[in-house]
Amino acid sequence: MESSRGRPGPETDLLAVAEHQALVFGGGPGRTSSEPPAGLRVSGEEETENVGGANRHPRTSPKTSSCGVVHRPEREALENEPGPQGTLSGAGSRRGAPGAEHEPSLSSRHKNPAPPEGKPSSGRDCRRGGPGGGMDVEQQEEEDNDEEAAAGSRAGRSFSSRLQDSRSLDGLSEACGGAGSSGSAESGAGGGRRATISSPLELEGTVSRHGDLTHFVANNLQLKIRLSGAPPPPPSAPARPCPAPAPTPTPAIPPIDPEVLRDLERLSRELGGRVDRLLRGLGGAVQELTALSVGCIQTYRDAVDSLGEAVDMSIKGMYTLLARCEELERALQPVQGLARQVRDIRRTLEVLEALCK
């Protein structure tokens, strides 16, 4: 289609094609000249951008193909052709022309409705406003960067609303593709100073851009971390009517014999009685051992007491014996004098005996 329209054809063919498109886009021959058709409006913008040099960067080819525009030879033929179509294209392509007076009504009339659920947004939905309004916004973007930021934020909001309306992965991918084309168009309108980044991140948080930096703030980060760490819940079964309760199957374990329970109770009682008697005997043995220990302690105490008394009596007897010996020594002092006299007498007798011989 592009190759066939890229080359200029005969003038008659171009006029026929232009009249056919004017009838299709205009809704009939009775359409007024105050509302130009969409194809001629887009062609007027492109002719102004390419010929007048309003922007430093030309529009890309996907925009021309998505909006269904007429190629330059056809536009030249339409401009040269006298009639309402040539007047409309000239009014859409020239700034400050009388056709610009109808720009507010055109932009308000041609606002894109919100895309229905399940339908991807096309390149024409990404383009907002009429031709004159788009040219005014582009001129304001070239003059002031604040207007460019406002246009970028509006494009991001429209993209996020389109993504929220999408209910399938295919719609989401196509919406991303449409937003990418709108982002490329806005970047071309801004003179290549900044590329608008539109991604599904805007659904998960807040995306802010400062120059070349893109900041992303996630919503409910702790909840997302908790959900990512928690095991997935089991799929809930679909609600269905409650069937009649099935008969309970017979258990595989046979019924318990009551005699076994009685024997178990009797044996438990006997075991409890034996344990009680054992505990009582153990308590009596402990008491006997305690009494024996007390008797041994008392006997030891009595032995120690009697030994102490005996030692005390022996000490007292020794001291008494010493006293008696001292008394005896004092009593034997005269005997020593008698012994000396006896020795003197014996010596005298020996001397007398020697004289007698």
Swiss-Prot record:
Q: What does the organism's lineage look like at the top? A: Eukaryota, Metazoa, Chordata, Craniata, Vertebrata
Q: Which Pfam families match?
A: BORCS6
What keywords were assigned to this record? Lysosome, Membrane, Phosphoprotein
Give start-end positions of Pro residues composition bias. Answer: 230-256
Q: What is this protein called?
A: BLOC-1-related complex subunit 6
Any keyword Chloroplast? no
Kindly list the GO CC terms recorded for this protein: BORC complex; cytoplasmic side of lysosomal membrane
Hey, which family's this protein in? Belongs to the BORCS6 family.
User: Recorded GO terms, molecular function?
Assistant: identical protein binding
Q: Show the ranges annotated as biased composition (Acidic residues).
A: 138-149
Stretches with biased composition (Low complexity) = 90-99, 150-162
Annotated organism of origin: Homo sapiens
UniProt-annotated location(s): Lysosome membrane
* An example Gene Ontology biological process: regulation of endosome size
UniProt KW Membrane keyword: yes
